[in-house]
Amino acid sequence: NYTPKLIAESIKKNSNININNISSINYKLFPSPRLRLLGSYLEFEKSILIVEDAEIDIILNPLSVINYKIINYNKILIKRGFSIIKINKANQLFSYIKKNKKKINIEKNNIILLKENKKLFEISDGQVKLSSSKKNQQLNINGLFFDHKTSFILKNRFDGSTKIILKIPKLDISTEIILEGKNNFKTYEGLANIKVLNNFFQFNFVKKKNIIIKKGFLRSSMINSLFEGEVFFNPFFSFHLDIEPSTLNTGNLI
């Protein structure tokens, strides 16, 4: 029989994942040979990704199933439960994706994205795909955000920058951000393109203690404007913007 100790040692050795709290282990022959673990807690590398209360299928190499002393697997499939992804550990996550040789898929999972231990947003019934190529490492998340289909992509590009894409089609929201991070993303700068209900925003920004917005541009059906300013997070969220209208579409006011 496959023991929890053998499974934990194999997953740690081959995928650098710590696994705990295995409540049950079942062997399934169909649709392919696999071990099914229930109630498990997974910690990827140094807490770059955490999965709790999940159902885990370890898809075994068919040629090795007769040897119970060795676990040779091709893929890990994680279902249900919830996952925690820390955005400020994006570089470590991309490094993990690049080094990992085993396929890892996450399905029907609630996914919580954190920034400095604060929740950014949560996607329910989510599907996560980790992929790597010579030029990019990429994290794809698809699921529901307030019952609306949502697509979130985190991509590490060959030039060292990070691209973040968020799309919620039903709400007419589309966001694309390119980040240049320093000190594990404690400080960063970048370019944001945001479209909300036919309103288009573009601006450069620098994040240190606060977020400084530069060279901002707003285009809507009624007005085009330039803007700059600063966004504050302490002691509470607030912002100050200097807005300079450049074009007023008076025809849309009638």
Residues covered by each model-derived region:
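Flexible beta-edge/linker motif
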Residues: N20-N117, E122, S131, Q137-N140, ...
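Short alpha-helix boundary/capping motifs
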Residues: Y2, S133, K195-V196
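Short, ordered beta-strand-loop transition motifs
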Residues: L29-P31, S131-K135, N156-D159, K182-F185, ...
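Transmembrane beta-strand segments that form the barrel wall of outer-membrane beta-barrel proteins
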Residues: I106-I111, T162-K167, T187-N193, I211-L218
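Hydrophobic residues embedded in beta-strands of well-ordered beta-sheets
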Residues: S83, K135-L139, G160-T162, K186-Y188, ...
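Amphipathic hydrophobic-ligand
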Residues: I17-N20, E45-L60, N88-N91, E116-K129, ...
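N-terminal type II signal-anchor transmembrane helix
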Residues: N1-N16, S47-L49
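Short beta-strand element of the conserved SAM-dependent methyltransferase core
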Residues: L42, I78, S83, L130, ...
